Structures are given as C-alpha cells and as structure tokens.
Amino acid sequence: MIKSFGNKETEKIWDGIQSKKLPADIQNVARRKLRMINNSQNINDLRIPPANHLEKLSGNLIGYYNIRINKQWRIIFKWENDNALDVEIVDYH
C-alpha cells in the first residue's frame, strides 16, 4: 500500500488530477503503475508484468526501488514493512 508520496505531482496523478508538470502521454500509464504498487502485498508482486523492470537502486538512491513507466520515466519508492513510501515519478535521463 502507498503510505506517502515524494512530491505533489505524483500525488495529483494518484488522485486522478492532470499534472501540468508531467507529460500528458505518461499520466494514465503512471496512474495504472501506482495502482499496481498500491495493490502489492510484497515487493516481488511488482516483478509481474516483466515490463515493470523492477530494480533495486544504488548510489544516492540506496534503499529505493523503481519500476518503468516508459524508457524515460520511472516511479521510484522505498519499500518497508510491505508498504511503499516516498513514491515519486521521475525523469530518469
């Protein structure tokens, strides 16, 4: 379950509100991926579908995971006690 968001724009997408700061063409896919995160019982649930490309991050994002929206955009989040924290849509490039 999603417990917190990393920024207001991601929370807007979750709430079904269009964001002017994020590309319109990713918003529906991002909302669907946010629902997947919210409905996950554990982190391994996000390995399916394989198109999510679930990854554990390193470097300055150690402790975070990400799934892909598309080639450019990702949803990053922390996973603790079967909950997603600091969920945020980011431009990965």
Question: What is each of the regions a protein language model found here?
Answer:
Residues 77:
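Catalytic-pocket segment enriched in acidic/His residues
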Residues 1-69, 80-93:
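Basic, Lys/Arg-enriched alpha-helical interface segments
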